């Protein structure tokens, strides 16, 4: 799947409440595992499909973000939703810091530094 995000994606793991209306107009609720997040979107793992184009509310302690489901794919352990936050809804670590949060750019930087210091020079 093509990654169209402009902002950096933060890997994370936390449970959030989700709410949406199904095709008959009934409100559905569930708990989702927040897989990653950026300023303008998130990836959520849920136990049932949510159709593309559905407006979804993601609630966390002290706040919520509204977005639209851009994709829903099944992968071995559940359904993964790509959610694009609606205008005026942007994620910020000041408002919500997931329980486990990792910036993969920092990890790559650390590995690169370690490789530079751990690799012996080549000898001809």
Question: How should each PLM-predicted stretch be described?
Answer:
Residues 1-124:
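Structured alpha-helical
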């Amino acid at each position: 799947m093509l990654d169209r995000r402009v902002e950096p994606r933060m890997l994370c793991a936390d449970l959030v409440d989700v709410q949406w209306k199904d095709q008959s107009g009934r409100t559905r609720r569930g708990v989702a595992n927040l897989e990653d997040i950026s300023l303008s979107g998130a990836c959520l793992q849920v136990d049932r499909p949510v159709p593309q184009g559905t407006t979804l509310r993601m609630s966390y302690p002290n706040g919520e973000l509204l977005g639209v489901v851009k994709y829903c794919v099944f992968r071995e352990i559940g359904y993964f939703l790509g959610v694009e936050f609606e205008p005026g809804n942007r994620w910020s670590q000041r408002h919500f810091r997931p329980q486990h949060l990792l910036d993969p750019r920092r990890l790559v930087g650390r590995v690169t530094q370690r490789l530079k210091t751990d690799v012996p020079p080549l000898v001809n």
